[in-house]
Structures are given as C-alpha cells and as structure tokens.
C-alpha cells in the first residue's frame, strides 16, 4: 500500500478537525499502519493559529482516551499538493475549499466527512463551539463513525 495523506478541515482547527485527526490516527495505529499514513488537520480561518484544541474538546476527547496535542494552523493552498484527500466537516468548509481549488484535480481531492459515516446519518459535522457538552459528545460520535468508514473506504 502506498502512503496516503489525509487532511481534515474545519473552520478554526480547534474542535472538529483536530478531533478527526486524533480519531483517524488511533484507527491507523491500532491497525499497525502508522507508516502508511500522513494525517493532519487545518482550519479555514487563521484566528486560532498556534493554539491547542478547545479545552472542552480536549476534555471530552480525553474521556474517550484521545489526547489532542495538535496546534491550530490555517489551510494553505499548498495543502492541495501535499495531501491526497482533504476532508471538510460541513458545507461551509467544502465551499471554502472548492473556492480555493485552482484545478479540477485539486477539487477532486475534497470530500465531506459525513459521506464516510456507516452507522450514523448526518448532513454535516456540526460545530460544537457555541453549544453545550452534548454537542462535543455528538461530534466525537460522528467522527468515530466517519473515520471508521473512511478507513474501510481506503480498503486498508
């Protein structure tokens, strides 16, 4: 298997995309395939550049055994060259990514996270930033399901 590079993208890179990165990293690690994947996350905005994930997301992630150590970074046009798949959390992310894509090849690298869900059905991964505790739990549930589906999709 060739190395696959996957970039998860949300708005600020402090809740959903770093969580998706951690979930997918765990799945890859548990299957002994860490050397076969490059996994990262980014945000469409640079507002939180350099910050750790939101403290609430880190708390709920830790309850499930995930440790979010990623520091937020903004999406860069060069990410189209550096990643095989760029996975957005909601339609706003997808639209912003498509607006940055300069070629059909770049546009074809863009996917919706929820399209990989197997057991849960959702139209997007909602941003939990302005919501309550249950929103963070729901996001992790969606991401665990979608990341498992993504792993299966890649026929690993």
Language-model segment annotations:
Residues 46-51, 79, 89, 102, ...:
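Acidic pyrophosphate-coordinating catalytic loop
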Residues 1-82, 152-156:
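Conserved active-site segments centered on acidic
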Residues 85, 91-156:
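Phosphate-binding/catalytic loops
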